Amino acid sequence: MNLFASAGYLKGSLVASSNAVVFSYVLYLIGKYEYKVSSVELQKIIRKWIFMSTITGFYTGSTESEVEKQFADLRDVHHADEFVSYLNSVIGNRFTDDYFVYSLPAELNSSSANSPAWYGYIAAVNVLGTPMLFSTAPLSQYFVLGANGDKNSVDKHHIFPKHYLEKIGYDNDCIFRKNCASVPEERSAIPLQTEQSSAG
């Protein structure tokens, strides 16, 4: 079972922190064997944990002290429902209203197109089964291993040309970088039909 795939992280490149992978699986194993959490409930809480730990950078920085604190906290946890409640509590402390109102939008407005917040957005799109631009197929279909050989089956394209954005008053590099959509690679070589060509 691939917990990260079920949380929407269908490729290793979408996970910014390898520590998040290791310690999320450690928590999964502790929940399964130590606390005997039911399979359905355990998968649900660990998927939430994966999402929280990857987009907030939970395991970056002083990872050892964070993990030691977790293990110390778990000494006071004795039952399956307490284990789930503990993880929900840590998630809730990270995913506050302020996080969603201020921190996350600021992270998504970053000039980097490869931030943990952006990868979290892609993971959410995968989980929700959202179709790609100009396609009825979900984005997740194009992350399936072997779907397109070694070739990248997802391509990013700008929605509006940079010159047009500058003309209407947008001259911020963040806007230029975020002004894109994922489209299937096979369609990326096909030029979009203009109004003139469709009229003729």
Predicted regions and their residues:
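Polyanionic (Asp/Glu-rich) segments that form extended negatively charged tracts
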Residues: 1-33
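Conserved structured core elements
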Residues: 14-22, 40-43, 150, 180
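Generic hydrophobic alpha-helical scaffold/packing signal
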Residues: 25, 43, 47, 157-160, ...
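Intrinsically disordered, low-complexity N-proximal targeting/linker segments that flank membranes
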Residues: 54-164, 185
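Short beta-strand-alpha-helix junction that forms the catalytic/metal-binding core
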Residues: 154, 166-192
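Domain-exit/linker segments immediately C-terminal to small folded modules
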Residues: 196-200
